[in-house]
UniProtKB/Swiss-Prot annotation:
SMART domains: CYCLIN (SM00385). The gene is ssn8. One of its GO terms (cellular component) is mediator complex. The lineage of its organism: Eukaryota, Fungi, Dikarya, Ascomycota, Pezizomycotina. This is RNA polymerase II holoenzyme cyclin-like subunit. SUPFAM superfamilies: Cyclin-like (SSF47954). PANTHER family: CYCLIN.
C-alpha cells in the first residue's frame, strides 16, 4: 500500500478529534439507553485488548502477517464509529474484518477456511453459513465507503531506522509499541508517522538493558513509563533539554528540527501510559462473558 498518505482517504475521512469520537459514542449511548443498561461492557481499551488477542489467535491458525491483523483492527474501529457494538455480533465483525484485511494486504484466505477456523475458536458465535460473513463483508465495506487502504506506522519506523541509528532491539520494541497503539483510539486520532515517532521515542528512552520483544510491549514498558514518562514528556516539550544521554539528545534534536507534531507525539505517549495502566484490570474471562451474554440474549449469533 504505497499510496501517498497525505492524499489518502485515511487522512481525509478517517481521522477524528477526541471530542468527535466522544460525541459519536454519546449518541450511541443516548440512542439505546436500555441496551447500555442491560449489557454493560468493559472499558473500550480492555475490549480492544480482547479483540486483538482473538485476532492473533485467528491469525496464527493461518500464519497471517502482522500488518493484516493491524488493518483488521483499524477496520473494526472504523465500523464501530458507525455502529453501536451492542447491535452487532462482535465475533462476526472481527472475523469479517480479518477476512477483508487479508485480501487488502495481499495475503488472501478462502472464505470457507476463515469461517472454519473462526468456528473452531468461537463455535457458539460463528455459524457454518459462509453467506453470513459475505453479508457482513458487504456491510463493512459499505460503512467504510469502500475506503479500505490503511497506512500504518511500521513503514515510517523502517524508514527512520538508519537515520536515527536505531538498534535491532530498539526497532523491535518500537514495533511492539506500534502493535499496542491499535488497542487505543490513536489510529483514529493521529497520522501514522506521529505514531511511529512516538514508538521510537518510547523504545529509545525506556528500552530495558536486554530483552526479546514479541507482540505487546506492555510487560517491559508499563512500570518504566509510569515512573518516568512525565520526565521524558517534559524534555520533548522543552526541546532543548540538557543532560540526557547522547542518543536521547540526538533524538530530541532531530525532533526539534523535524516538522513532526510534537504536541501529538506527547499526547500519544500519554495515551500509551494510560493504556498500560488500564491493562492491569484486563480479564479475558470477563470480556468473553459480557460479550457472550450480550450476543446470546439479543440473538445476534443467528
Amino acid at each position: 500500500m504505497a499510496a501517498n498518505y497525505w492524499a489518502s482517504t485515511q487522512r481525509r475521512h478517517w481521522l477524528f478529534t477526541r471530542e468527535k469520537l466522544a460525541e459519536i459514542r454519546e449518541i450511541f449511548r443516548e440512542g439505546d439507553k436500555v441496551a447500555h443498561s442491560q449489557f454493560p461492557l468493559p472499558d473500550q481499551r480492555l475490549l480492544n485488548i480482547y479483540f486483538s488477542q482473538q485476532l492473533i489467535k485467528l491469525g496464527k491458525r493461518m500464519s497471517t502477517r502482522q500488518q493484516a491483523l493491524a488493518t483488521a483492527q483499524v477496520y473494526i474501529k472504523r465500523f464501530y464509529t458507525k455502529n453501536e457494538i451492542r447491535h452487532t455480533n462482535p465475533y462476526l465483525v472481527l472475523t469479517t474484518a480479518f477476512y477483508l484485511a487479508c485480501k487488502m494486504e495481499e495475503c488472501p484466505q478462502h472464505i470457507r477456511f476463515v469461517v472454519g477456523e473462526a468456528r473452531s475458536l468461537w463455535p457458539e458465535f460463528i455459524t457454518p453459513d459462509v453467506s453470513k460473513l459475505g453479508e457482513c463483508e458487504f456491510s463493512l465495506i459499505s460503512e467504510m465507503n469502500s475506503q479500505l487502504i490503511v497506512h500504518h506506522p511500521y513503514r515510517t519506523l523502517s524508514e527512520l531506522q538508519p537515520e536515527l541509528s536505531l538498534t535491532s532491539d530498539e526497532v523491535a520494541l518500537a514495533w511492539s509499541v506500534i502493535n499496542d497503539h491499535y488497542l487505543t483510539d490513536l489510529p483514529l486520532l493521529y497520522a501514522p508517522h506521529v505514531i511511529a515517532v512516538m514508538a521510537i521515542i518510547v523504545a529509545v528512552v525506556f528500552k530495558p538493558n536486554s530483552g526479546n520483544f514479541h507482540g505487546s510491549a506492555a510487560p517491559v514498558l508499563a512500570g518504566a513509563m509510569r515512573d518516568g514518562g512525565m520526565n521524558v514528556l517534559a524534555a520533548l516539550g522543552d526541546r532543548t533539554g540538557s543532560g540526557p544521554p547522547l542518543k536521547i539528545q540526538k533524538l530530541i534534536n532531530w525532533l526539534a528540527e523535524s516538522e513532526v507534531d510534537i504536541k501529538g507525539v506527547i499526547e500519544c505517549t500519554q495515551e500509551l501510559v494510560s493504556l498500560y495502566e488500564v491493562w492491569e484490570q484486563y480479564s479475558e474471562k470477563t470480556c468473553k462473558e459480557l460479550l457472550g451474554r450480550m450476543v446470546k440474549a439479543k440473538n445476534l449469533d443467528k
